[in-house]
């Protein structure tokens, strides 16, 4: 029996859970349940990520303490996870004594080995709010192209990256005040000292997905930098211990103590389980799972989003190795969620909160749909509402549940719920049993979409068998009563096997199926067992079809969520940003039609797409725009795409912009994308029928 500890990334305690979050928690939960079903001892822990400036500011805006703020959000998160059947063994908070003790211990060990250094850092400071400003709280004019209202790290217009101190006419988005430069002593974790270790660690077989490992090699080539692990007061978090007396308090940056939260949640669970004799909740040893000398005894896996690979595959293993703790056995990254082919949108009603979805639709619908889309690759998945409705209705209602519903009626009506004493089709049942090995392997390898396809193939065989035997016709013929019972017994047994295979994805459905089948066990090992001479209970509908009206109501409610729940903090930030604008700017929200017609949008095809050496946010494109010579375009989308993802794609390019000289060359156009450069950009691609060189009108 393998001993496995599993974590999901910690949701930030600053707002509700939405469907984008749920991709990860559903993926992890399915994997955990699948491994538990195969009799492994698996422990799944998580916690709220409860520190940082954003939480401090939101609490202030809401008129509560940070502790009250995070307690309210934690309760909301736990309620949402419960609705979606996420089966944590423990759900904790990074604002805990366990996390404080472990964070301080790791820091002290790193410091004791000389892995911590200090240096003075010049930062922008908000004189009205009395705090140093992170890049996201500073806006101004791009130092390269002059575009207004650009964030403090990169320009959304020309793609240039820069330091916040380089912005022209900067202002604080928190107060509207003009920030001033101040110097502060910061503490750094010397990541370059672990470069040799990390180069090997990231190449170890099974540690990372190949695409992630390849991405990390690029970062190694660019050179690792020391990591700033401190923040100045005021800050909601843990004070850094052992700082020189008389110096201002320093706090751990949220990304230092957040991953330590995995350890803290597990340690908290170990305390809860101390002395336990319950085999379902066994006693656990913290040291067995976290000490370096025990890393071959137990396994540790992190499920994360692709946007936080840098922290989990570089900083985190280096911190652990430098403080005498074991490193993860594997770090598994997933892509982002798209809805109807686009980034989630509040205005379109596709930025859907977990609570809103559960109000209108069975959460297990989403669990199945995500499972049907997820693979072991780092790929975005698309929740297409039409496909979602069709797949759930066809696969789950029309195929799987239909096997039971079309057979159970005969068994109840004609045989008082009793199944046949023998199996009329042993080879068919054995075929379904044999499929279990491949399904189990697909689950373990996180190839959930493959597992769902294999399960649906089994369901198809069951329905084909029923259709070929036609028990409804047999039932009308005198003397064929035994045949009807035999056919329905085979169907019910296949249904039982399918419930074994679907249990990790649909735990509530399988619990209801247990009640119908009058059994207690649907573990993976039980797939060999047959229900013969066994009495089942009266069938009740196990899953309802999705109606378009339910989806429409959910989307409408999501739009109302946008209108009804703007946070006080969001209002304050919006007002602060507006304070720096002139009345003229506020009156110029509209442009003339003639101005719009000046923009030349052209169908372009990507001939080449490459990384830009020395630019961590740019991709370089060679585009065919239907003219004699292709054009060169730089686009700030590197963190959202690998070059090969865009090869040969047809895109929209603004082709009458004045060429812009940049550090890396001349950009002769602009590729159109949708979304937020902070969280995810989606390049707008066109169907093959669009002709290169055509203009959009």
Curated annotation (Swiss-Prot):
**Domain of life according to the entry:** Bacteria
Q: Known catalysed reaction(s)?
A: tRNA(Met) + L-methionine + ATP = L-methionyl-tRNA(Met) + AMP + diphosphate
State its cofactor: Zn(2+)
Query: Per the record's keyword annotation, is NADP included, yes or no?
Result: no
Binding-site list for Zn(2+) = 142, 145, 155, 158
Q: Where is the tRNA-binding domain?
A: 595-697
Record Pfam families: Anticodon_1, tRNA-synt_1g, tRNA_bind
Q: Name one GO cellular component term.
A: cytosol
What family does this chain come from, according to its entry? Answer: Belongs to the class-I aminoacyl-tRNA synthetase family. MetG type 1 subfamily.
Question: What's the protein called, per UniProt?
Answer: Methionine--tRNA ligase
| Originating species | Psychrobacter sp. (strain PRwf-1)
| Protein encoded by which gene | metG
């Amino acid at each position: 029996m393998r001993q496995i500890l599993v974590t999901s990334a910690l949701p930030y305690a600053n707002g509700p859970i939405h469907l984008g979050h749920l991709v990860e928690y559903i993926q992890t939960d399915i994997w955990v349940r699948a491994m538990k079903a195969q009799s492994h001892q698996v422990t799944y822990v998580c916690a709220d990520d409860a520190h940082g400036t954003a939480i401090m500011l939101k609490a202030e805006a809401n008129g509560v303490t940070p502790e009250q703020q995070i307690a309210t959000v934690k309760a909301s998160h736990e309620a949402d996870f419960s609705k979606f059947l996420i089966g944590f063994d423990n759900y904790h908070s990074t604002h805990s004594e366990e996390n404080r003790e472990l964070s301080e211990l790791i820091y002290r060990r790193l410091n004791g080995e000389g892995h911590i250094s200090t240096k003075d850092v010049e930062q922008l400071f908000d004189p009205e709010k009395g705090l140093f400003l992170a890049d996201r709280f500073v806006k101004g004019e791009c130092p390269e192209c002059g575009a207004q209202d650009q964030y403090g790290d990169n320009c959304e217009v020309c793609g240039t990256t820069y330091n916040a101190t380089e912005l022209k006419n900067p202002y604080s988005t928190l107060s509207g005040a003009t920030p001033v430069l101040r110097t502060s002593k910061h503490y750094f974790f010397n990541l370059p000292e672990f470069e040799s270790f990390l180069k090997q660690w990231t190449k170890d077989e099974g540690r990372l997905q190949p695409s992630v490992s390849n991405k990390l090699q690029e970062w190694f080539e660019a050179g690792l930098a020391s990591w700033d692990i401190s923040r100045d007061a005021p800050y909601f978090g843990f004070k850094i211990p052992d700082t020189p007396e008389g110096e201002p308090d320093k706090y751990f940056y949220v990304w230092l103590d957040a991953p330590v939260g995995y350890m803290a949640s597990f340690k908290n669970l170990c305390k809860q389980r101390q002395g336990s004799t319950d085999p379902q909740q066994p006693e656990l040893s913290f040291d067995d799972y976290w000490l370096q000398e025990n890393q071959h005894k137990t396994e540790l896996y992190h499920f994360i989003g692709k946007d936080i690979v840098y922290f989990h595959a570089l900083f985190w293993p280096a911190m652990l190795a430098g403080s005498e703790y074991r490193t993860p056995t594997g770090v598994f990254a997933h892509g982002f969620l798209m809805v109807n082919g686009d980034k989630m949108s509040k205005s379109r009603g596709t930025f859907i909160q977990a609570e809103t979805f559960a109000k209108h639709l069975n959460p297990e619908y989403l669990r199945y749909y995500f499972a049907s889309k997820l693979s072991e690759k780092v790929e975005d998945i698309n929740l297409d509402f039409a496909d979602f409705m069709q797949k759930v209705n066809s696969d789950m209602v029309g195929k799987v549940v239909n096997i039971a519903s079309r057979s159970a009626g005969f068994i109840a009506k004609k045989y008082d719920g009793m199944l046949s004493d023998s199996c009329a089709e042993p080879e068919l049942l054995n075929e379904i049993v044999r499929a279990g090995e491949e399904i189990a392997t697909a689950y373990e390898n996180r190839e959930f979409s493959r597992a769902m396809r294999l399960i649906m193939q089994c369901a198809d065989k069951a329905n084909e068998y029923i259709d070929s035997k036609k028990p409804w016709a047999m039932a009308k013929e005198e003397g064929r009563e035994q045949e009807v019972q035999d056919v329905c017994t085979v169907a019910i047994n296949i249904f039982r096997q399918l419930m074994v295979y679907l249990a990790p994805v649909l735990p509530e459905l399988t619990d209801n199926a247990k009640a119908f089948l009058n059994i207690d066990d649907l573990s993976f090992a039980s797939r060999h067992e047959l229900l013969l001479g066994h009495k089942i209970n009266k069938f009740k509908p196990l899953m309802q079809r999705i109606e378009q009206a339910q989806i429409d109501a959910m989307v409408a409610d999501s739009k109302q969520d946008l209108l009804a729940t703007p946070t006080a903090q969001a209002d304050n930030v919006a007002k602060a940003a507006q304070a720096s604008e002139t009345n003229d700017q506020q009156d110029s929200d509209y442009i003339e039609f003639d101005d719009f017609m000046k923009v030349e949008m052209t169908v372009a095809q990507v001939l080449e797409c490459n990384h830009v050496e020395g630019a961590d946010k740019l991709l370089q494109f060679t585009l065919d725009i239907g003219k004699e010579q292709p054009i060169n375009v730089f686009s700030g989308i590197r963190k959202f795409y690998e070059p090969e993802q865009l090869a040969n794609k047809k895109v929209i390019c603004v082709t009458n912009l004045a060429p812009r000289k940049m550090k890396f060359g001349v950009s002769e156009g602009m590729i159109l994308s949708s979304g937020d450069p902070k969280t995810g950009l989606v390049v707008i691609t066109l169907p093959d029928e669009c002709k290169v060189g055509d203009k959009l009108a």
